Amino acid sequence: AQGLTARLQSYESRLNTMDSQINEQLRAEAGTVNSIASNIAKLNQEIIRTSSQTGSAPADLLDARDQQLALLSARIDTSIVRQDNGAINVFIGNGQPLVLGNDAAQLVAQPDRFQPDRVTLAFRTSSGSVDVSSSLSGGSIGGLLDARRELIDPARNELGRLAVGLAEVTNLQHARGVDLHGDPGGDFFAVGGVEVLAARGNDGNATLAVTRTGSGALTTQDYIVQQSNGSWTVRRAD
């Protein structure tokens, strides 16, 4: 029993380590994206100024901006809109404007609203920030988010389901036997309850509890429970 428990805990520890590494990489990538966006905005400003004076932008400025765009595209998918004045606008995610002319916005790494120890990426606005992790794709950032979403999370949930299933089957078999005193066998493993995580920013006072009726009904999915106008909805987190 101790050997099995240690093995499962070892797998969980490896997944946690991978999660932490992705957190650090996302923080670093967000900083790099912001630096590139700032460079593009500055080059836009110089291109606009030079074009207004000479009628065309110098090739070296255009080449420098193209290099910055290539660096940005290596990290995240973008869409580009070229302006008549020589500037370009850069959009990410679901159309969030990362660069508008000579203004650059910011991509920030912030705690996940359900799991504060996990980093998500948000687009900073004048009124706060908007989580855009689910809409970002491509490049190194898209790869990190995909690794978390498609590899780490399913593996962790599958590991949990495996652990619960093994524990329940073992406990059931153990209960069918008797101990040295002739008493019915008890549970061999203690199985934890279902974890419910409150979202950051909740303004209600409702509390939720989930009861597990058997491992056969478990899935590898996470679910979001929301309340609106007195009605509750449950949907898959992905």
Question: Can you annotate each of these PLM segments?
Answer:
Residues 1-238:
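Structural signature of extracellular appendage/secretion-system components
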